[in-house]
Curated annotation (Swiss-Prot):
Its EC number is 3.2.1.4. Belongs to the glycosyl hydrolase 12 (cellulase H) family. The keyword Protease does not apply. Has carboxylmethylcellulase activity. InterPro entries: ConA-like_dom_sf, GH11/12, GH12. Keywords: Carbohydrate metabolism, Cellulose degradation, Glycosidase, Hydrolase, Polysaccharide degradation, Signal. The keyword Hydrolase applies. This is Endoglucanase A.
Length: 239
């Protein structure tokens, strides 16, 4: 749920790159692959990210992880991210995305999710926001989003649990809405703007004053493993 502060930036020709340090990152605009072990000190274990293909047309990568201890805490959010021009959510016409992924060990505590941040200030740090939108394509074990379930909604032709909760990030309150699939969705193409439209119409999300500042897709491991999470291909754009 937290975005890495990039400490290492590898060349765009990062195919085959292995990243094991806390905030390693590889980039080929507009895409990046990020290690992001932001919660590693809350448990014991290891994790590395392997870039399979990274270009201007998409990202393919996998991560191998094993974590124990710190039950109920996220250890990392290894992800692929998109660089885009920040704009008000109300001015975004569409956010098309497509992903195919797999998880070899499902006897773990983890989720597979999109993570987006918005903020009134377009220059807000991209590691948090006034609002966070998460789309859980899978959850394994007993993990739950922050807060509690407040509704069930059909968005993009699929049924989702809708959760809401708050947390303190960088000294300020962050409001998090999570849409959770009832069973794993290993291949998905959709428009994330549909989720913002739902929140605007049903939960009072202030789309006309919030800028979209971050868009990522990855996995949050809590405990378990060894496990391998593989992204065969991920694409996204903000229009």
């Amino acid at each position: 749920m937290k975005l890495s502060m990039t400490l290492s930036l590898f060349a765009a020709t990062a195919m085959g790159q292995t990243m094991c340090s806390q905030y390693d990152s590889a980039s080929s605009p507009p895409y990046s692959v990020n290690q992001n072990l932001w919660g590693e000190y809350q448990g014991t274990g290891s994790q590395c990210v392997y870039v399979d293909k990274l270009s201007s047309s998409g990202a393919s990568w996998h991560t191998k992880w094993t974590w124990s201890g710190g039950e109920g805490t996220v250890k990392s959010y290894s992800n692929s991210g998109l660089t885009f021009d920040k704009k008000l959510v109300s001015d975004v016409s569409s956010i098309p995305t497509s992903v195919t992924w797999s998880q070899d060990d499902t006897n773990v505590q983890a989720d597979v999710s999109y993570d987006l941040f918005t903020a009134a200030n377009a220059d807000h740090a991209t590691s948090s926001g006034d609002y966070e939108l998460m789309i859980w394509l899978a959850r394994y074990g007993s993990v739950q989003p922050i807060g509690k379930q407040i509704a069930t909604a059909t968005v993009g032709g699929k049924s989702w649990e809708v959760w809401y909760g708050t947390s303190t990030q960088a000294g300020a309150e962050q409001k998090t809405y999570s849409f959770v699939a009832g069973s794993p969705i290993n291949s998905w193409s959709g428009d994330i703007k549909d989720f913002f439209n739902y929140l605007t119409q049903n939960q009072g999300f202030p789309a006309s004053s919030q800028h979209l500042i971050t868009l990522q897709f990855g996995t949050e491991p809590f405990t378990g493993g060894p496990a391998t999470f593989t992204v065969d291909n991920w694409t996204a754009s903000v229009n």
